[in-house]
UniProtKB/Swiss-Prot annotation:
GO terms for cellular component: host cell cytoplasm. Residues 103-131 are annotated as: Disordered. One of its GO terms (biological process) is symbiont-mediated activation of host autophagy. Residues 39-75 form a coiled coil. Induction: Expressed in the early phase of the viral replicative cycle. Induces host endoplasmic reticulum stress and consequently activates autophagy and NF-kappa-B signaling pathway. In turn, may induce autophagy-mediated STING1 degradation and innate immune evasion. Keywords: Activation of host autophagy by virus, Coiled coil, Early protein, Host cytoplasm, Host-virus interaction. Residues 116-129 have a biased composition (Polar residues). Belongs to the asfivirus K205R family. Its main location: host cell. This is Uncharacterized protein K205R. The keyword Nucleus does not apply.
Length: 209
């Protein structure tokens, strides 16, 4: 027969063992949760790194697009400036540069400027008068003394400086355009197709001065 004191200690040891088992199980659960948390945290960091990389890629693409846009705008500005410069040369000197594909043989000189820095040119006249060949005076301080609308609408001017072949091409290519829109389209076409590389280089050098 077990004595009461011995039974007490046995019961105490049994209770301690059970408590230790419970603590061990709790520790195991905590370690599992820790492992799960670490895995989740690693996954989160991977997703964060991926997101950061995607943001950087988007930023690089945006900067590339911005640089391309600036380059296109600069190239367009040079081309339009070169077209205007060529028109200025034609209008002031009355003699266009030799064309790359078609020589403008029909071009003739405009009257030279007078001492008052004025020049007489032929235009279609005002829409109300209906007169063609009316002589008007314009100040040469503005080198483009032909306005854009006059260039786009003046048949005598076009016939004076463009060969029939070029006029036919422009009329066919840009029949659906009028006014300033047609001027820009025709100018860009002439720049791309009628200017030699040497002429383009010369005009670009002029624009830098």
């Amino acid at each position: 027969m077990v004595e009461p004191r011995e039974q007490f200690f046995q019961d105490l040891l049994s209770a301690v063992d059970k408590q230790m088992d419970t603590v061990k199980n709790d520790i195991i659960d905590v370690m599992k949760e820790k492992t799960s948390f670490l895995v989740s945290f690693e996954n989160f960091m991977e997703r964060y790194d991926t997101m950061e990389k995607n943001i950087q890629d988007l930023q690089n693409k945006y900067e590339e697009m911005a640089n391309n846009l600036v380059a296109v705008m600069a190239d367009t500005k040079i081309q339009l400036g070169a077209i205007i410069a060529q028109l200025e040369i034609i209008m002031v000197n009355g003699t266009p540069l030799p064309a790359k594909k078609t020589t403008m043989k029909d071009a003739t000189s405009l009257p030279p400027p007078n001492p008052n820095n004025e020049q007489s040119v032929f235009t279609n006249g005002s829409p109300t008068s209906g007169k063609i060949g009316e002589t008007v005076k314009k100040n040469l301080t503005n080198a483009m003394f032909f306005t854009r609308s006059e260039w786009a609408s003046s048949e005598p001017f076009r016939q004076k400086f463009l060969t029939p072949e070029i006029q036919a091409i422009l009329d066919e290519q840009f029949a659906n355009k009028t006014g300033i829109e047609r001027l820009h389209a025709e100018g860009l076409y002439m720049w791309r197709t009628q200017f030699s590389d040497e002429q383009k280089k010369m005009v670009k050098e002029m624009m830098k001065k």
